[in-house]
């Protein structure tokens, strides 16, 4: 990773329940060079619509990267030809190359996975009462991680 905003990494942290029983799926997006967390949005599901909305907002705020590196889970990849999903086709149309790590090799996105470990420890133990309150925790974490270097 040779320059800011060239390669972004993205992943869902994995679902968990808030104290009211609602599932939360944190979508995280990181600049691969600077390790700046561009976004962490708690979604109600890992749907195309929600994921595309988050990326659209990030593109508007930070511009378009050249590459987005993800794992092989939905909505990033499918079992179709070349594993292209509707999301990755959208990225291609925007001029972004979707780069998939090898299946079952999360270490190929190791920096991102390490950030996830810290995110989980700092924001979900215990989980917040609601998804809205959980998002506030994610927002505080982003501020501390990006601006205060506390992790």
What are these regions (language model features)?
Residues 81-86:
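Charged helix-capping and loop-helix junction motifs
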Residues 58-80, 102-104:
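Acidic/histidine-rich, metal-coordinating catalytic segments
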Residues 11, 29, 35, 55, ...:
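Mobile genetic element proteins and their domesticated derivatives, centered on retroelements
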Residues 1-30, 36, 44, 48-57, ...:
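Mobile-element integrase/transposase regions
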């Amino acid at each position: 990773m040779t320059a800011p905003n060239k390669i972004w990494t993205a992943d869902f942290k994995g679902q968990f329940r808030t104290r009211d029983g609602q599932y939360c799926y944190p979508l995280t997006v990181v600049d691969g060079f600077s390790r700046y967390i561009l976004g962490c949005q708690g979604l109600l599901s890992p749907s195309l619509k929600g994921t595309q909305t988050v990326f659209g907002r990030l593109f508007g705020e930070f511009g378009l990267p050249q590459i987005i590196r993800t794992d092989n889970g939905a909505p990033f990849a499918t079992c179709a030809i070349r594993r292209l999903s509707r999301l990755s086709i959208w990225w291609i149309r925007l001029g972004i190359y979707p780069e998939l790590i090898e299946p079952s090799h999360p270490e190929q996105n190791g920096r991102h996975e390490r950030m996830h470990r810290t995110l989980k420890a700092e924001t979900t133990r215990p989980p917040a009462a609601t998804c809205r309150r959980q998002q506030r925790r994610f927002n505080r974490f982003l501020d501390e991680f990006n601006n205060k270097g506390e992790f």
